[in-house]
Amino acid sequence: MRAPFFLPHLWRAAVLTLIALSALSACQERSGAPGSTRITLLNVSYDPTRELYNDFNAAFARHWKAEHGQDVRIDQSHGGSGKQARSVIDGLQADVVTLGLAADIDAIARSGKLLPLNWQSLLPDNSSPYTSTIVFLVRKGNPRAIHDWGDLAQPGMAVITPNPKTSGGARWNYLAAWAWALAQPGGNEASAREFVRHLYKNVPVLDTGARGSTTTFVQRGLGDVLIAWENEAMLALRELGSDQFEIVMPSVSILAEPPVAVVDTVALRRGTREVAQAYLGYLYSEEGQEIIAKNFYRPRDAQVAARYASQFPQLKLVTIADFGGWASAQRTHFSDGGVFDQITAP
């Protein structure tokens, strides 16, 4: 039986620590050395992909065994996307990274020099095999009558969202809110800044990652609304039931494109590069795209997307290009002393 996705913080932290230690221990040997009958990969991923990669890893292991006669085990490490990127830069031996946004893999390429700067061009769709967007999860009956972004800045509203300094999903949340404010009559950078400032005044706690915020909202019962990845909100309905929560689709959201990459320096040293490349490539296969859709991420493959069209409502979406790309957005909003720091300063 699959464990509940809203595991308590301490239990979850202990599990992740054990996984990381196990993976680091495994990295002491050349996992993919010629003649190996078993190979081990470490996938360092962002917070709410546990269920997706639990299913995908099993499928890829079957595929690789059938094609190559070799057993493969994929270990997972999960956390806020920015925090995970920092762990890889600081030495966590990831063969692949599957993070929440391109800026975090850019940081690994620039600061860690662990993969090429053109990593995004090495796989289809800018190395983003699935997409998502940002929605609201509210309690059944929507008792606070939350319908759009403007409601989240009302006095007395309790909004749950993670910390953009550590969480990729939180940065998508922030930018979606900013985009809505810009789209309002007379909207401009000053009015967007003021709106987002009021919204974050209503946030009682900033968890480090999206799954932590989900736990805060659904298990601890804090908050009136959770700003969430669409897949995370849909998972909550599946796991906990539509009798407890419901999803509200805002009038404007953002196209979130979580990227993936092989960490070349690590994979070459460990002899796992061929398997790591195949692993990420299999995300684009029909089976991979089916698993993606079943786990509530929006698939890239047109035929698979058509089969799941009723699962994913159409939304007005801005893109990161509307913010000048991730390098510009990161520098303006999320760098030390950036807009987020300014509007949340005491």
How would you label these PLM feature ranges?
Residues 2-15:
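Bacterial N-terminal signal peptides that target proteins for export
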Residues 267-346:
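Extracellular/periplasmic juxtamembrane helices and adjacent flexible linkers that interface
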Residues 184-251:
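Ligand-binding pocket segment of bilobal, Venus flytrap-like solute-binding proteins
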Residues 34-167, 309, 344:
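N-terminal segment of the mature folded domain
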Residues 141-147, 166, 179-187, 266-274:
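Short helix-loop capping/hinge motifs at secondary-structure junctions, enriched
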Residues 44-46, 138-140, 158-185, 199-203, ...:
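Short beta-strand->loop
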Residues 27-30:
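Bacterial signal peptide processing site
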Residues 134-142, 257-274, 291-295:
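A bilobed periplasmic-binding-protein/Venus flytrap-type ligand-binding module shared by bacterial periplasmic
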